[in-house]
């Protein structure tokens, strides 16, 4: 299984080792920066200060002005992201819309699907169509720097996760805010219950969004893990990023530098909300190592989160192959159908 995972992982030959950067220019628009302007701090101590302040007042860190320019063109929803970046393509959020057939008198439910890192615009669409056939209208969002939103200079979504500390935080903050903005649109269309389905990187984004938004009552985390830094440092598919990072920083310091975008920072906050959660992980995952997934589940037990667990005997990449992708899809769809 691990040999198969390695072959699937490294069939991509366009990974680039990019240099380490603190990326302080990406912090300028953060709410924490307005409260704590840089004043003689060295880059690392300033990033840590912004992380501490962001975690302490995370509602403000992930706060946003709801978009006012939602427009649905056929099956594509577009709106301007509340987070501005130097890349015009990335500043326009795209969502592919899969509406369910309306049944008079039935409650209107919807879900937002957050794909994996480097997903193409077609990936996850089959899942969305299946959910729509089950009566769950589904919006598949393009993550920051992905597919429709990818700057022309890129072949991969390298700016979403990279050895640039500030830019990675900014992309994550943008993803969380974009997802919450999608919920604003769904509410405006009359949907009374909204679920989230996040896969891999999308799972991290989904958890952060749900921890800060009561509207996401039903959540599926398809591949789950703990600290953002640990996955990047240990995971097979991010070893090129680690090569850039480890010239300057070690894992313990990286955890602190990315604390504000790490799910464990908000586990108590998540547990306080009324959520129903499904955690799916792969026993032979070399990208989201199983011991990290099991820590997530242990924390869910300790904090009394209403949750279910599915452990599949495959790996991260093989989950996208027959028969695992169909088994995975069954668990996702049936959980949403029962709980939304």
PLM region descriptions:
Residues 198-203, 282:
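Conserved alpha/beta-hydrolase "nucleophile elbow" surrounding the catalytic nucleophile
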Residues 113-173:
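Cap/lid segment of the alpha/beta-hydrolase catalytic domain
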